[in-house]
Amino acid sequence: EIQKSYNRYAYLPQTLPENERKLSLNDYFFGDLEVELDYNKLYRFAQELKFDSQRFTSQQTLASLSGGELLKIQLLKILSTDWDLLFLDEPSNDLDLDTLIWLENFLQNTPRTVIFVSHDESLLSHVATKIIHLELIKKKQEARTTVRNLDYENYSQESQETFKKQIKDAKKEREEYQKAMAK
């Protein structure tokens, strides 16, 4: 359960919803009157991400943007809102190296809570401070959740050691079973 101390959530989906792809950049940034943007942040982040702020009022559709540009404009908008808790779904997909480095730096330094899903081991090792590992076990029939207060490198090492021990234990059990059956 999410703590009640979080009042404002922001979410960056892995893919932009189809209805939003039809929007112009102008409509995406300024068309939704319910979204309160901090324009100082918006223009500062645009400069940091080397995004030409003149394009904010462009009629260019989101569908015409490259994957990296699309992710960048979503980051610009979301990070310019007032959020307590940020959810990111595969935030490093399609990003160029400069933007990825910027994102890692932002995530390392933000005082706010960010939860992200990623298969990018580099991003995980540079940024993650707590791991929530979701997996399907027993022939993908049973869900298991592991929560560890470790960075990714230590979690990965711990997982490998646990796996090696499980293999060793299974081998020992099999040998003991075979000995018992041979009698």
Q: Where are these predicted regions, by residue range?
A:
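Flexible nucleotide-interacting loop at or near the entrance of a catalytic core
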Residues: F163-K183
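ABC ATP-binding cassette signature C-motif
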Residues: E1-Q166
